């Protein structure tokens, strides 16, 4: 099953367009996990088990693992997701961007080492930096477009042939790079006007939408701008607001409650 097929099925069977980010920060873990050698693995497994029925996808952020020399625990988490929740896509948030030969190694890392269904990539170096990912036709390639951070405007609004750069990227991906129907775009919830413009450009292409929760994006405005005609098409990501809803032994139950509330809030505006 391709990433797009798996995601489309998850939207329906899970009744969810909530993507749950896995950004483990041991400094925010509850006291009973502090100092344990497998704290990251135990924390993430508990979050996954508590929230899986509320999610259309999980998105581990590779930097949170690499900074702690915990890539082996990330491998275990991805394996755990594949084995326990094979119907839920795993998006490796890596935002890689490099020359073709190096990109090939990053693609192997994402899809062979971690077994991810999709990966985020940076398009700044052009097609040959993205091509190795696209060659895995069953995998998803999620391209940065209009990012949720304020500094994204430094580059993404630069004029490119009469349109801002982020719109040029949206056209480029939709018209030229998506020949296998495997692409998606990252567009921030913090910019609903631009989100609506990207949706108009790319049609039914899936959008990974960070920026709700801790970053302050409005769910109603996000859904109204990002949904497709049938009310789907989105992976609306929330990480910190779910992961760290409660800093004690009840952290997983609290995460579940926030995840369910967020999923339901998204669904209210999808009709």
Curated annotation (Swiss-Prot):
Pathway(s) per entry: Pyrimidine metabolism; UMP biosynthesis via de novo pathway; UMP from orotate: step 2/2
Q: Which InterPro entries does this entry report, sorted A to Z?
A: Aldolase_TIM, OMPdecase_AS, OMPdecase_type-2, OMPdeCOase_dom, RibuloseP-bd_barrel
Q: Which enzyme type, at the first EC level?
A: lyase
The biological processes this protein is annotated with in GO are: 'de novo' pyrimidine nucleobase biosynthetic process; 'de novo' UMP biosynthetic process
Q: Where is the active site?
A: 95 (proton donor)
Q: What does it catalyze? A: orotidine 5'-phosphate + H(+) = UMP + CO2
List the PROSITE patterns hit by this protein, alphabetically.
OMPDECASE
Q: Which SUPFAM superfamilies match?
A: Ribulose-phoshate binding barrel
Q: Which domain of life is it from?
A: Bacteria
Which keywords belong to this entry? Decarboxylase, Lyase, Pyrimidine biosynthesis
Look up the EC number in the record and give it: 4.1.1.23
- Which GO terms of the molecular function aspect are on file? orotidine-5'-phosphate decarboxylase activity
UniProt key word Repressor: no
Q: Which Pfam families match?
A: OMPdecase (PF00215)
Family to which the UniProt record says this protein belongs: Belongs to the OMP decarboxylase family. Type 2 subfamily.
In Swiss-Prot or TrEMBL terms, this protein is called: Orotidine 5'-phosphate decarboxylase
Q: Which gene encodes it?
A: pyrF
